[in-house]
């Protein structure tokens, strides 16, 4: 309700929201300060971050690279360090793709774990609020605040957040792809 929800469509720029999304209210109740809304692929229908009349969000690594989308502005704002976390949506990759392109965490929870009430729907049965952050710990913290049952969201369900022992690790591990895997994905990776 603090800002217009345009879905990157100029025609919606005069529409005032009557209420916040459920998850935004939970964050504000916990002390989060709403900075603003970010750009996206229009109506959340793109995975590149370039389908918008409001200007393209470029990758934080190179202005010539795409940021990924559709929640491009949210991912770039976290990757640039403007905010410690941001919300987006994820129906078919709109949270995970821009997170990958900008080297941050993009958490898509199981459908119904976070209320989608107040989110402009692309596909109501698949839409999820996604969380962008620089660290898994921050994503877990935001998730623990917004993961609440919402009786007004038909998909919402009660769920108890479990501890995440994989966040606390004393050893560093990494994998090396074998020759067959490298060949499958790209000859230039060899």
Q: Residue spans of the language-model regions?
A:
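Short Gly/Pro-enriched turn/cap motifs at secondary-structure boundaries
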Residues: 14-16, 64-68, 96, 120-122, ...
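Acidic, glycine-rich active-site loops and adjacent beta-strand->loop/helix elements
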Residues: 40-42, 89-95, 99-101, 180
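Alpha-helix boundary/capping residues
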Residues: 30-31, 50, 101, 111, ...
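Short, hinge-like loop/turn segments at secondary-structure boundaries
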Residues: 52-55, 102-106
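A short helix-breaking turn/cap at a secondary-structure junction
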Residues: 105-189
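Conserved active-site and cofactor/substrate-binding residues in soluble primary-metabolism enzymes
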Residues: 18, 22, 72, 89, ...
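Short acidic, glycine/serine/threonine-rich loops at helix termini
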Residues: 3-5, 45-49, 96-101, 118-119, ...
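Gly/Ser-rich catalytic/binding loops embedded in alpha/beta enzyme cores
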Residues: 1-91
């Amino acid at each position: 309700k603090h800002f217009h929800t345009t879905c990157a469509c100029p025609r919606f720029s005069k529409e005032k929201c009557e209420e916040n999304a459920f998850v935004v209210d939970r964050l504000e109740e916990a002390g989060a300060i709403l900075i603003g809304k970010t750009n996206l692929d229009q109506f959340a229908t793109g995975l590149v971050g370039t389908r918008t009349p409001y200007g393209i969000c470029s990758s934080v690594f190179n202005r010539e690279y795409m940021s990924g989308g559709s929640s491009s502005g949210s991912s770039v704002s976290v990757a640039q360090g403007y905010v410690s976390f941001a919300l987006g949506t994820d129906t078919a990759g709109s949270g995970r793709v821009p997170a990958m392109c900008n080297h941050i965490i993009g958490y898509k929870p199981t459908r119904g774990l976070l209320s989608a009430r107040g989110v402009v729907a692309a596909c109501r049965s698949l839409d999820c609020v996604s969380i962008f952050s620089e660290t898994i710990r921050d994503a877990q913290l935001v998730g623990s605040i917004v993961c609440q049952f919402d009786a007004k969201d038909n998909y919402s369900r009660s769920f108890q957040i479990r501890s995440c022992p994989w966040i606390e690790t004393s050893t560093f591990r990494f994998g090396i792809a074998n020759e067959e895997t490298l060949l499958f994905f790209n000859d230039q990776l060899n």
